[in-house]
Amino acid sequence: MRLVLLGPPGSGKGTQAAQMKETLQIPHISTGDLLRSEVVAGTPLGLQAKQVMAQGDLVSDAILIGMLESRLSHTDVVKGFILDGYPRNLSQAAALDGLLAKFGHPLNAVVQLEVPTDVLVERIAGRAQAEGREDDTPDAVRKRLQVYNDSTAPVIGFYQQRGILLRVDGVGRLDEVSQRIAVALGC
């Protein structure tokens, strides 16, 4: 099963992806983790990304899709994968579609974790306080969420048009949300 897990910051994507990895026995591919490991490994794409990040810029879609192409060529993804943190915009969604078409393996489903803004703000602010982060004020969190919503709304529409978007309530205990995802996927 080839899946994308979408959701705003604080929605529990990483937690749910880790749970789904165990349940479905397929790899969890986090673009953030992938980027960091490519940089540490000193791959050509990792070196390009490091140079871009050192200048304070965002890593280009071309570099990210190159890293994904490399990762998706590994044998452990033959039975599927859970992609977390990508795509974040419409051009990335189109690039991912093209890449998966090249491999002959289109996405089976896109799971959108839906969590109300007030719950997200509470989760992130609580996490920030526990970690001693002063930059995650409620106003800063709301701004990040707005940026996420503005860039990701077209992606959600893109997958909804294709009939593979599954909306899942992301509020509740870990096991409750995991169960909702499993039901939505028909597992």
UniProtKB/Swiss-Prot annotation:
Residues 126-136 are annotated as: LID. InterPro entries: Adenyl_kin_sub, Adenylat/UMP-CMP_kin, Adenylat_kinase_CS, P-loop_NTPase. Its main location: cytoplasm. It is an enzyme of class 2 (transferase). Pathway: Purine metabolism; AMP biosynthesis via salvage pathway; AMP from ADP: step 1/1. Its EC number is 2.7.4.3. It is found in: Cytoplasm. GO terms for cellular component: cytoplasm. GO terms for molecular function: adenylate kinase activity; ATP binding. NCBIfam families: adk, PRK00279.1-3, PRK14527.1, PRK14528.1, PRK14531.1, PRK14532.1. Belongs to the adenylate kinase family. Catalyzes the reversible transfer of the terminal phosphate group between ATP and AMP. Plays an important role in cellular energy homeostasis and in adenine nucleotide metabolism. Consists of three domains, a large central CORE domain and two small peripheral domains, NMPbind and LID, which undergo movements during catalysis. The LID domain closes over the site of phosphoryl transfer upon ATP binding. Assembling and dissambling the active center during each catalytic cycle provides an effective means to prevent ATP hydrolysis. This is Adenylate kinase.
